[in-house]
């Protein structure tokens, strides 16, 4: 099951529509308890880096997603701002990134 993280800034519907058209099992994740059973994670993002980091950090999902990725080895794919969030920081903002990629 693919989990698409919905932290308030993302093209969630686009992912959902694509997965539905190919009958790919997926779940839109809005709360950390919904991450149970997820085998792959999509971290989308649209908009400004700082806004995305603030929203993700206050979503309550960061620690759970981090544990899934690093301890349980669940693959994650960042798309658009979601990919930028995986790095240390962005030239387009002042917030710290997740620091999962040394960039």
Please identify what each model-predicted range represents:
Residues 2-24:
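N-terminal beta1-alpha1 ligand-phosphate binding loop
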Residues 4, 41-42, 78:
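Conserved SAM-binding loop
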Residues 26-37:
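Short acidic low-complexity segments
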Residues 47-103:
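Cysteine-nucleophile active-site neighborhood
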């Amino acid at each position: 099951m693919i989990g698409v993280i919905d932290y308030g800034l993302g093209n969630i519907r686009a992912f959902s529509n694509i997965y539905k058209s190919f009958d790919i099992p997926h779940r839109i994740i809005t709360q950390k308890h919904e991450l149970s059973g997820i085998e792959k994670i999509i971290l989308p993002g649209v908009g400004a880096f700082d806004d995305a980091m603030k929203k993700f950090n206050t979503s309550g999902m960061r620690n759970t997603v981090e544990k899934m990725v690093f301890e349980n080895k669940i693959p994650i794919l960042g798309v658009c701002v979601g990919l930028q969030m995986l790095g240390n920081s962005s030239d387009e903002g002042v917030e710290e990134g997740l620091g999962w990629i040394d960039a």
